[in-house]
A protein has these predicted regions:
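Bacterial N-terminal signal peptides
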Residues: 5-16
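Flexible loop residues that form catalytic
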Residues: 62, 130, 174
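Active-site adenylate/phosphate-handling loop in enzymes that bind or generate adenylated species
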Residues: 116-162
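C-terminal accessory domains and tails appended to enzymatic cores
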Residues: 153-158, 163-165, 179-180, 186-289
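Extended hydrophobic secondary-structure segments that form protein cores and membrane-embedded regions
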Residues: 164-174
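Active-site rim/loop-helix segments in enzyme catalytic domains that contact anionic ligands
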Residues: 18-120, 142, 150, 160-161
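Short acidic, glycine/proline-rich loop/turn micro-motifs
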Residues: 66-69, 180-184
Length: 289
């Protein structure tokens, strides 16, 4: 009974907060144009539909991710794809001009990340963990971690006012086990927006229908028609939630979690603000709906 009363109290407080029109600012970092889409696309759509402000930032321009072209020609295509994807997701999409495959955790890049977080006045910052097969993915995680404290330090990047409070920093889900596996704290069921997520992702034609199939040796299997391509992309992303995600989802969604087909999971990073359950519900109001 006490647990029921507590849940009702948290829901009431979160509902009151957002009924007053307060918006949440979420910024998501990825290494390449399309990374944010894969990891947080459904969550972004849900938050945007609730009126919150979401921004995707790619730390490289993606100019190496193709088998038949590269450099400036490819960068232009990938920037245009990201712009179209942003429209479909309902988010702002920024692509920084670092070369694909050459991202390094330099001071210059750290300052770029700090400025992006500050300019967005972020409440939540999402990025990959620094455990990954791709160096650009790893260093994206490192750069965001390195910015976590510095975003509130006035004398660092002083041309952009510091944040008055440290954001919540979250890791997006991955399957890597060493040095430690991903441990979800926040599960977002995206079943209701899975199809719109796939449609938005399909804006990255050079990646999902050319580059990635080529690297997998399946280029000849890519359908020629849009419907077939959407089905192919949906099948690729239709992965049943693992046990850890489902267990985490039960905490927030109750019995509804057992019916979930698609969940985006997030782990709280130790370096930023450590949110309470009530604060998590305020930042991710879809958890109480």
């Amino acid at each position: 009974m006490k647990r029921v009363i507590l849940i009702c109290y948290l829901i009431l407080n979160a509902t009151l907060l957002f009924s007053q029109g307060e918006k949440v600012n979420i910024i998501v970092f990825g290494a390449h144009p399309d990374d944010c889409d894969i990891d947080t696309g459904g969550t972004a759509i849900l938050l945007a539909k609730l009126g919150h402000n979401v921004k995707f930032v790619s730390l490289t321009n993606g100019d190496a991710g193709h088998y038949a072209m590269g450099g400036g020609e490819l960068a232009k295509i990938r920037i245009a794809e990201a712009k179209e994807a942003g429209k479909r997701f309902g988010v702002e999409y920024t692509v920084l001009d670092n070369h694909d495959g050459e991202l390094m955790p330099t001071l210059e890049n750290r300052l770029k990340v700090i400025r992006e977080i500050r300019k967005w006045n972020a409440d939540v910052v999402i990025a990959p963990r620094p455990n990954d097969y791709h160096p650009d993915h790893r260093y994206t995680g490192v750069l965001v971690q390195d910015a976590a404290y510095m975003v509130i330090v006035p004398n660092v990047a002083p041309e952009v006012p510091p944040l008055q409070k440290n954001p919540v920093f979250l890791y997006s889900e991955d399957g890597f086990q060493k040095p430690s596996p991903f441990k979800p704290d926040i599960p977002v069921i995206i079943d209701a927006v899975f199809d719109p997520k796939i449609y938005a992702m399909s804006a990255h034609k050079s990646q999902f229908f050319e580059w990635l199939p080529w690297t997998a040796g399946n280029l000849e299997k890519v359908p020629k028609d849009d419907k077939g391509r959407l089905e192919m992309l949906a099948n690729w992303r239709s992965q049943a939630p693992n046990e850890a995600l489902l267990k985490c989802a039960e905490k927030w969604y109750g019995n509804k979690a057992s019916y979930a087909k698609h969940i985006e999971g997030f782990e709280i990073c130790e370096y930023g603000k450590q949110p309470t359950d009530q604060e998590i519900m305020m930042l991710f109001p879809m958890l109480i709906r």
